[in-house]
Amino acid sequence: MNHTETKMLAILKKLKASHGGISVKAEFEAEGTRIDELYRLVEIARRADMKIALKIGGCEAIRDLMESKQIGVDYIIAPMVESPYALSKFIEAKNKVYSLEEQEGTEFLFNIETITTFNNIEVMMKIASDNEGVDGAVFGRVDFSGSLGLGREEINTHKITDYAIQAAKLAKTAKLDYVVGGAVSADTLPSLKEIHSQYLTRFETRKIIFNADALDSNNIKDSLIEAIHFELLWLLNKRTYYQVITEEDNKRIDMLQSRWNILSGEDLI
């Protein structure tokens, strides 16, 4: 591990020990996490005794599910599941890749991130809670707001919070885990606490997932700052990693290009 990764590990240990942090999160979907990046994240998380959550590329992303199983992901989230049929395809896909025994150590969740999903939510919660269904749902506030034509500045309004609470009540009735994420910051705390008063299992920033009870802690704002610190270090570490790869071949490229120009008498490009 390099110096930056050592700092990241220290943050994760701190979050787990006294801030309610339970998992690190990556995305094959919007974030476009590459497999080598994911391996680095997994190693750091495992050393901190943290779980791994991964948002796959879609409801029927078989390849992503296979890689998730090989890596040993703890939470798998399917994005943009907007209809009962899409949810059934996710359930079919995870049952194809994971045996019932293998599913015992993994939680499968679907995203509630558009108004279309919300309009189908009662039927979808029933499907999700079937014996071979899924374990929970994640309310994604950013895309949900966007699906209503609202900007990020309106994410913390009562309108979005009310939708999240309605979904929370249905998840509670269905005995499913319920997670809220999307632009989570100190400004989000009143909204999250209101949702938590009804039902909430976990909440998440871009890279860190917290137990919902962390909202009752006096150091919750510090927890969110540490989550930002971790994400920033992760991005800096990723940038350095690819800069090193880029520099690896630069000298060889310069030498070969000069040789080409001399031998051919023309520019390569």
What are these regions (language model features)?
Residues 1-269:
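Expand to "…catalyze enediolate/carbanion chemistry for C-C bond making/breaking, isomerization
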